[in-house]
Amino acid sequence: LVNSQDVNPTSGTEFFLKCLVAVLFSFVLLVIYIAFRFKKIGGLSAGVFALVALVHDCFMVYAVFVFCRFPIDANFMAVVLTVLGNSINNTIVVYDRIRENRNLYGNSLSLKELVNMSITQSITRSVNTTVTTAFAVLAICVVCAICGVTSIMTFAIPMMAGLICGTYSSLCISGPL
């Protein structure tokens, strides 16, 4: 057997439930990790706010799939996991900058000023990383459009939207909250 695709309603439901369990399990581990790593800047609340941003990202990727009428399949799971990885990486960069600035400036800055300064310091890095990745995904979109390969487009289009939403949520949702 070289390849098999089972597309009945039962297998679709099973696939969705397995994906949901995998994402929920990763969310729990993520909150625990952030709670320990960033104890000085809020710990558990930092983990919960990072999770809020990630749920936002998952919803946005899902919305793109629905809007474009793409099937919820393995591409969906790949896009969600990739966007979550990118988004949490950007969030951790912001949190790390907040922690470093807290150590550097102590209590001389208000929390609002500290977060604002930290986001300002990390925005260029986050945007540049996202733009670089988005250009690579855009190149894939162009080549797929020219060659008529639609299967990869169901990955590339939601991926671009997810990258943009993930960067937004890292800078504008998880940090300020």
PLM features: residue spans?
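A structural signal for conserved, well-ordered secondary-structure elements
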Residues: 1-177
